[in-house]
């Protein structure tokens, strides 16, 4: 009898231990979406694929802590960003490294894109053709900013960051070709300096960004802080999110790089100008804070039809 009781105690203890939640607070309602969750903790070099029970289904290991983007591709490969510290770009979301792992955790391609005057940051996006879109911050010097009509009072750090979108075509194990490019600095308007080419009435140019609109920042170099980039293959359009502007922008991806630097060309005839923007009408002199609809948003994305 004593042996039986001891056995039952051991069995119940083991059962309780196995039944305990070892991965933190867990909620899995009947109506929850039946899918996996991809997680890359900010202070870890690990990436986890979890099921709805909180169990680790698969795991990848990098030598870099994450940037701010990770994707599980249809073929089972893992595409992620890694963080490389850059003293010239000190803001949340800095990456600088892109890595591609196969299902068995083999690193099959990597690409470094960070230097003293530029860095990949926040989001990337895998395109259907195998190319990769990425957000890049590049330095506009004080002279370049003034030439573009920046008010000197809005140059508190002596420079500003241009936000750039690059489409790269990976090859080899650590290389890529840039096959398409878009820059916000090509699509600015300002009403401060009438001697500059981009001088105009801000309210009459909602398809361009007011270079002197300062929102939720003290005119620092990081005046836009774009944090998300997504692609719609049916429309061949991009949606770009600016946390500091509290706006999202729709951009034509069908343009050539040359057209993307202008206001003409592409499927929609607008070049690289905004096709649509939403979130903060005050940013283009069409509203005030009373009718602002976005506030420091992250990760807008396209919703499938239906």
Regions found by a protein language model. Give the residues of each.
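Histidine-/acidic-rich catalytic cores in large beta-rich domains
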Residues: 20-306
């Amino acid at each position: 009898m004593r042996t039986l009781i001891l056995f039952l105690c051991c069995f119940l203890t083991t059962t309780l231990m196995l039944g305990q939640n070892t991965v933190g607070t867990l909620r899995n309602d009947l109506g929850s979406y039946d899918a996996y969750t991809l997680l890359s903790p900010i202070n870890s070099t690990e990436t986890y694929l979890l099921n709805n029970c909180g169990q680790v289904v698969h795991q990848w290991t990098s030598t870099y802590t994450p940037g701010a983007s990770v994707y599980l591709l249809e073929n089972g490969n893992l595409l992620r960003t890694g963080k490389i510290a850059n003293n010239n770009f000190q803001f949340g979301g800095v990456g600088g490294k892109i890595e591609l792992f196969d299902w068995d955790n083999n690193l099959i391609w990597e690409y470094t894109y960070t230097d003293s005057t530029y860095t990949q940051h926040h989001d990337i996006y895998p395109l259907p053709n195998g190319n990769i879109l990425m957000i890049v911050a590049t330095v506009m010097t004080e002279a370049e900013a003034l030439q573009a009509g920046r008010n000197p009072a809005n140059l508190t750090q002596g420079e500003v960051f241009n936000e750039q979108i690059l489409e790269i075509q990976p090859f080899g194990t650590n290389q890529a070709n840039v096959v398409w490019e878009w820059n916000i600095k090509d699509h600015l308007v300002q009403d401060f300096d009438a001697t500059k080419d981009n001088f105009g009435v801000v309210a009459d140019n909602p398809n361009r960004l007011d270079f002197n609109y300062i929102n939720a920042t003290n005119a620092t170099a990081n005046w836009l802080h774009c944090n998300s980039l997504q692609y719609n293959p049916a429309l061949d359009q991009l949606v770009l999110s600016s946390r500091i502007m509290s706006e999202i922008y729709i951009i034509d991806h069908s343009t050539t790089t040359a057209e993307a630097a202008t206001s003409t060309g592409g499927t929609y005839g607008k070049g690289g100008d905004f096709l649509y923007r939403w979130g903060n009408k005050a940013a283009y002199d069409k509203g005030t804070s009373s009718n602002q609809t976005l506030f420091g948003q992250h990760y807008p994305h396209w919703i499938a039809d239906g």
